[in-house]
Each structure stands twice: as structure tokens, then as C-alpha cells.
């Protein structure tokens, strides 16, 4: 399978992607990780307004193969939850980078996106040459 690695995304070691928009962080899971999970059957996410620490679980993705937790790459408050993904888990599978985003985070302090991998670095980690 051919995966998309948009240049405007950064990635955590645990396969979450981050898109910075106007000081907020849109967080989702990479196409690569979603493909590894297989058919997604259930998504559970933290509540809007929840304040979580970096590395804490903010949700669970259940597939026919496994149940995986998703982790926050930065501390902050969840200001928006993608209810569409909860109601229709296939969105995550069909468009993880577009309509399949998970949460929007207001970071506790200035988030340093530079601490995450660039798209190129992430691609070289997950796609064998």
C-alpha cells in the first residue's frame, strides 16, 4: 500500500500525527498505523474539555485485529472531539488525515512541534526502503 505523508504534519513515535493550526493542534493517527490495524469497528475518545498530560491516553481504537490506545504528544485541553469518527469509525480508516482526525488540543504552553518527527523522518521509520 502507498501511504500519504503530507509535509504539514509531524508525527509522534506512537504514530499520532499533529497539524498545527492557529495555535491549536489537530491530532489523529497515521495512515500507516490505521492500515496495520485493519478494519476499524469502534472508536472511543476523551471528553471535550478534558485536560490531559503529555503521554496520557486520549482514546482507544478497536479493530478486528486489536485494541490500541492513542496518546497525546503534548499536554493541554481537548477543545474539540470528532464525533463523526465515533459514530462512523470507517471514517478513520478511509480518511485518517482528512475527515478522520480525532481531537483538537489547546496546548498547555507553546507546543514544540520540532520535538516530533517530520513527515520525511516518520516515513523513513515506517516504510522500508
UniProtKB/Swiss-Prot annotation:
Domain Lipoyl-binding: 24-106
Keyword terms of this UniProt record: Lipoyl
Protein name from the UniProt record: Glycine cleavage system H protein
Entry-linked CDD domains: GCS_H
Task performed by this protein: The glycine cleavage system catalyzes the degradation of glycine. The H protein shuttles the methylamine group of glycine from the P protein to the T protein.
Pfam families: GCV_H (PF01597)
Entries under PANTHER family matching the protein: GLYCINE CLEAVAGE SYSTEM H PROTEIN (PTHR11715), GLYCINE CLEAVAGE SYSTEM H PROTEIN-RELATED (PTHR11715:SF3)
GO biological process, any: glycine decarboxylation via glycine cleavage system
Necessary cofactors: (R)-lipoate
N6-lipoyllysine carried by residues: 65
Amino acid at each position: 500500500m502507498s501511504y500519504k505523508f503530507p509535509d504539514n504534519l509531524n508525527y509522534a513515535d506512537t504514530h499520532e500525527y499533529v497539524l498545527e493550526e492557529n495555535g491549536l493542534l489537530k491530532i489523529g493517527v497515521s495512515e500507516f498505523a490505521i492500515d496495520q490495524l485493519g478494519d476499524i469497528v469502534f472508536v472511543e475518545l476523551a471528553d471535550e474539555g478534558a485536560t490531559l498530560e503529555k503521554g496520557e491516553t486520549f482514546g482507544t481504537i478497536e479493530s478486528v485485529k486489536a485494541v490500541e490506545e492513542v496518546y497525546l504528544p503534548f499536554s493541554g485541553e481537548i477543545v474539540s472531539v470528532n464525533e463523526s469518527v465515533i459514530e462512523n469509525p470507517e471514517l478513520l480508516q478511509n480518511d485518517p488525515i482528512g475527515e478522520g482526525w480525532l481531537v483538537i488540543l489547546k496546548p498547555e504552553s507553546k507546543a514544540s512541534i520540532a520535538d516530533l518527527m517530520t513527515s520525511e523522518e516518520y516515513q523513513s521509520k515506517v516504510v522500508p526502503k
